[in-house]
Amino acid sequence: MRILGIEGTAWAASASVFETPDPARVTDDDHVFIETDAYAPDSGGIHPREAAEHMGEAIPTVVETAIEHTHGRAGRDGDDSAPIDAVAFARGPGLGPCLRIVATAARAVAQRFDVPLVGVNHMVAHLEVGRHRSGFDSPVCLNASGANAHILGYRNGRYRVLGETMDTGVGNAIDKFTRHIGWSHPGGPKVEQHARDGEYHELPYVVKGMDFSFSGIMSAAKQAVDDGVPVENVCRGMEETIFAMLTEVSERALSLTGADELVLGGGVGQNARLQRMLGEMCEQREAEFYAPENRFLRDNAGMIAMLGAKMYAAGDTIAIEDSRIDSNFRPDEVAVTWRGPEESVDSYRMGGDEVQGAEATVHFDGDRVIKVRVPRSYRHPTLDERLRTERTRQEARLTSEARRNGVPTPLVRDVDPQESRIVFQRVGDTDLREGLSEGRVADVGRWLARIHDAGFVHGDPTTRNVRVGGRDEQADRTTLIDFGLGYYTQEAEDHAMDLHVLAQSLAGTADDPETLLSAAEDAYRTESDHADAVFASLDDIEGRGRYQ
């Protein structure tokens, strides 16, 4: 099989030829050729008009170069009249003017050789190239690119967004900082270079469940430079903060799903510090990590051709009249036809006396639970100590506060912030994700309403952080645990964020997430004194994810 791939979502005009006897796996006979002509603005960031002009000039050239590459290679059954089996192109997400040029070129080549057309989601291609080349079965994927940052996991025929940026993409955030200090695009490599000579400078650390935000970090970083902090120190602080956030949410996704494989995608993934952090985190929790080589991390047509081959083999092609582009094409909108419905990132099984959570080790000792936030070697020591100490104190405080407000939580028996250690009463038989039901999820909605009315949030109300079960009449009892990301707030938006995190965790772990979420929301409305304001904020939050 030989597939021509065409990429041009923003800055990289790229074409590729992917040859393989089996698109489902890596073979010794695989061959990938990539030709790329990257747009580089004279100053500032990417300008859509200039980028489109570049695509108009460069796409025909890189496509012809890729087609010429097929000449001299083995034809199909001795017939060289059509040197490719299909044309795959990036339908989105991306800049509309650039995408239209790519789509036009793809249609022209498909008609020229009378071969099928395959429309590929750019972000899913970032994921699939890592899954393909790693040989992993069903990994969690961190996509860290210019306009995007999200955590994906496969379940029930689609890639589910387990977490994502709530404002700007990670690469764009870094570029905004570098433009502020007069550095040219792209800014990421320059930040990486200067960070090597810098000392850690503290910046805001924003993780909410498995979502994250970068705008506050960038504002603080720009202000720090303006205030005279050495730029090398600010760059070091940016790397240590942003990449620790991405690594933490990746670990939270592994913990939520029980997966033991992680792949990295996206151009920001070329950063060596980020790769080391992710590798250390996975090693610490005995998971496998894979980062493709750089030519497959940055925007490239090779990943488009590889995913195109999988889709073509599954019969997932489109007619030319249906091949319109979608500049807001979210990865969770893609019907994943090339994977079996029985596959899932969901492999979690509870068992044993010790459990590795997202940021702590939990040991069961009779009627006690001993939770220790062990040091995370991937984080800068100063940042790591601050987070572990703050979260230990906050968890103990809010667990007791929730209990005083009528929410079932375990008794706190001992706290040692210096050792990041808490001893709790043991509650429940298993996690909610192992015993999902409408009634139990409705209880979670009810408990969240009570703590919100009391003036604080849970911070991470996933199906891993609710214990269920008990003896006799308490068999359906639900108990909230792990308030480490919680904080005091009266803001409706902060309360809505709890509901958003719950919704994401249900999407990643439940077979019928919509029904379960409705049960939680109905119970919340009944219990809360401020439901209207909270749900208005929730609508706003859900419109902020990339390409909503």
Curated annotation (Swiss-Prot):
Active site: D460
Keywords: Acyltransferase, ATP-binding, Cytoplasm, Iron, Kinase, Metal-binding, Multifunctional enzyme, Nucleotide-binding, Serine/threonine-protein kinase, Transferase, tRNA processing
Keyword Cytoplasm belongs to the record: yes
Coiled-coil boundaries: none
Gene Ontology cellular component annotations, sorted alphabetically: cytoplasm; EKC/KEOPS complex
Classification via InterPro entries: ATPase_NBD, Bud32, Gcp-like_dom, KAE1/TsaD, Kae1_archaea_euk, Kinase-like_dom_sf, Peptidase_M22_CS, Prot_kinase_dom
Binding positions for Fe cation per the UniProt entry: H122, H126, D299
GO molecular function annotations of the record: ATP binding; iron ion binding; metalloendopeptidase activity; N(6)-L-threonylcarbamoyladenine synthase activity; protein serine kinase activity; protein serine/threonine kinase activity; protein serine/threonine/tyrosine kinase activity; zinc ion binding
Localization annotation: Cytoplasm
Residues reported to bind ATP: V355, Q356, G357, A358, E359, A360, T361, V362, K371
Catalytic reaction(s) noted: L-seryl-[protein] + ATP = O-phospho-L-seryl-[protein] + ADP + H(+); L-threonyl-[protein] + ATP = O-phospho-L-threonyl-[protein] + ADP + H(+); L-threonylcarbamoyladenylate + adenosine(37) in tRNA = N(6)-L-threonylcarbamoyladenosine(37) in tRNA + AMP + H(+)
Annotated region (Disordered), positions in chain: 390-413
PROSITE patterns according to UniProt: GLYCOPROTEASE (PS01016), PROTEIN_KINASE_DOM (PS50011)
Gene3D superfamilies reported for this sequence: 3.30.420.40, Phosphorylase Kinase, domain 1 (3.30.200.20), Transferase(Phosphotransferase) domain 1 (1.10.510.10)
Co-factor binding comment: Binds 1 Fe(2+) ion per subunit.
Names of required cofactors: Fe(2+)
Description of how the protein assembles with itself and partners: Component of the KEOPS complex that consists of Kae1, Bud32, Cgi121 and Pcc1; the whole complex dimerizes.
Family named by the database record: In the N-terminal section; belongs to the KAE1 / TsaD family.
Protein name per the record: Probable bifunctional tRNA threonylcarbamoyladenosine biosynthesis protein
